Amino acid sequence: MINKICGKIVEKRESSIVIVALPFEFEILVSSFCNAELGLQEDVEILTYLHLREDEIRLFGFLNVSEREVFEKLISVDGIGPKAALRILSGIKYNEFRDAVEREDVKLISNVKGIGNKMAGKIFLKLRGKLVKVNEASSGVLKFKELEQSIVNMGFDRKLVAAAIKEIMLIDEFLMLRQVDQEQFLFREILRKLSG
């Protein structure tokens, strides 16, 4: 499996980007939200999902692990393939989709192009309770252990710092950031939160 591609964006299309990672050039299908976050000539790290079929090979790209996990859960639903899953994630942000599934918000889900009430029901049945944020929050302190220690060294209480990391990792603004920007965002927000 190709887990991640690092390179420069040389072309942006309506539903895909083209990345040069020498000596290769990859076309990667992305959601409209992901596409909007990325700029031409930008050096990026894109998490990927490789879809292999007899008649086609496609790469799907994501800005973070959570978006990819929602995509992978979506394609496990009977009747939803990778292109349909990407269309859904272009109609509603992955974290809003996840919350809507937990609330069984038929109206919000069925407003997405190609999803009617029947398909929304299938999605709820298959995915309710499986798209929780627990993984993001619980892994946050481990992933940002050095950052946590740096802030503790500044005189802040470890428990308060760990709680702030978990809380900030669940907000939309953090989740939509590229990995390279997440640590700086966390540092700034934690100091603001704990100093205020």
Swiss-Prot record:
Residues 135-138 are annotated as: Flexible linker. Its main location: cytoplasm. One of its GO terms (biological process) is DNA repair. Residues 1-63 are annotated as: Domain I. It is found in: Cytoplasm. SUPFAM superfamilies: Nucleic acid-binding proteins (SSF50249), RuvA domain 2-like (SSF47781). Residues 139-196 are annotated as: Domain III. Keywords: Cytoplasm, DNA damage, DNA recombination, DNA repair, DNA-binding. InterPro entries: DNA_helicase_Holl-junc_RuvA_I, Hlx-hairpin-Hlx_DNA-bd_motif, NA-bd_OB-fold, RuvA, RuvA_2-like. GO terms for molecular function: ATP binding; four-way junction DNA binding; four-way junction helicase activity. The RuvA-RuvB-RuvC complex processes Holliday junction (HJ) DNA during genetic recombination and DNA repair, while the RuvA-RuvB complex plays an important role in the rescue of blocked DNA replication forks via replication fork reversal (RFR). RuvA specifically binds to HJ cruciform DNA, conferring on it an open structure. The RuvB hexamer acts as an ATP-dependent pump, pulling dsDNA into and through the RuvAB complex. HJ branch migration allows RuvC to scan DNA until it finds its consensus sequence, where it cleaves and resolves the cruciform DNA. Homotetramer. Forms an RuvA(8)-RuvB(12)-Holliday junction (HJ) complex. HJ DNA is sandwiched between 2 RuvA tetramers; dsDNA enters through RuvA and exits via RuvB. An RuvB hexamer assembles on each DNA strand where it exits the tetramer. Each RuvB hexamer is contacted by two RuvA subunits (via domain III) on 2 adjacent RuvB subunits; this complex drives branch migration. In the full resolvosome a probable DNA-RuvA(4)-RuvB(12)-RuvC(2) complex forms which resolves the HJ. HAMAP family: DNA_HJ_migration_RuvA. Belongs to the RuvA family. Has three domains with a flexible linker between the domains II and III and assumes an 'L' shape. Domain III is highly mobile and contacts RuvB. This is Holliday junction branch migration complex subunit RuvA.
